[in-house]
Amino acid sequence: MTPAAPIAMLAELTHRCPLSCPYCSNPLELTSRHAELTAAEWAEAFRQAAALGVLQLHLSGGEPASRPDLVEIVAAARAAGLYTNLITSGIGLSPRRLADLDAAGLDHVQLSLQGVRADIADRIGGYRGGFARKLQIAAEIARIGFPLTINAVMHRHNLPDLPEAISFAADLGARRIEVACVQFQGWALRNRASLQPTRAQVEEAKRTVAQARREYAGRLAIDFVPPDYFSDFPKACMSGWGSTGLNIAPDGKVLPCHAAETIPGLVFQNLRETALADIWTHGPAFSAFRGTGWLPEPCQSCE
């Protein structure tokens, strides 16, 4: 049976990043600049994605602003008819560059938040002055009128500041904040011993989010991504493997999800060699866990 079309695509434009966040989920072996897809190759990827049925495009990294051709890439996404969201730390952006991205057709900005105070944010990000730069860029985002989402990655060291992070997002004029407890993949897994929150911290975070949702109803949408470590079952992910979204790595490798390479034995195809529609429909990695036919009994027949 032919799978339904994907709705969203994550385009990891680069693994380069000026920050050094210990919770980064990128792989330990990063793609070099010389192996990255060119702007022309990304434009072709966007055309193929739109033809496949993709509606939403998320430009990520690394730090996508590390690419000098980011404006050209955004223009290509607009030409393909994709709703385009930029996921960024803000470092590498400027008022002029944001204006150029606006003119190129960028629809939305998702700004990461390492902390609500300069000392903590700059220490976590490993970039002196990064918090001040982020505030400047946030003000410019608001001035231009981009819809804004704040992405707050929470861990042992900043979870006590969660109420301030939520109010900070509201003060910036954000429409949404994603409160995401660290997902331990890539570099985050290597640093898990330092980042893992306590059960008490996670329970308090749940109460904080519930209260904030009542307080900010109609002003600020609040998403909460808990860690799996204190749950009886892992949370469902993206409505099922190979069902609603796909990722393209900086070198053109096509993945069912960001963490798919951590699963041994999967074979991933590359956009430089195989059409995106063929990868989505018939690719071995996408077919491996799509649907329920791969499940053993009694799981497969369980209601």
State what each model feature region is.
Residues 10, 14-17, 230, 250, ...:
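Residue-level signal for mature regions of secreted extracellular proteins and peptides
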Residues 2-6, 240, 291:
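Residue-level marker of regulatory loop/turn positions in helix-turn-helix DNA-binding domains and
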Residues 261-303:
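Membrane-interface junctions of multi-pass transporters
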Residues 83, 99-104, 108, 112-274:
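Radical SAM enzyme [4Fe-4S]-AdoMet core and its adjacent flexible, acidic
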Residues 18-26, 259, 297-303:
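Local cysteine-cluster metal-coordination motifs and their immediate loop/turn environment
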Residues 20, 24, 67, 96, ...:
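Residues that scaffold the ATP/ADP-binding catalytic core of kinase and kinase-like folds
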Residues 1-108:
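Conserved alpha-helical substructure of the radical SAM core
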Residues 39-43, 67, 94-96, 118, ...:
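Structural motif corresponding to alpha-helix initiation and N-cap regions
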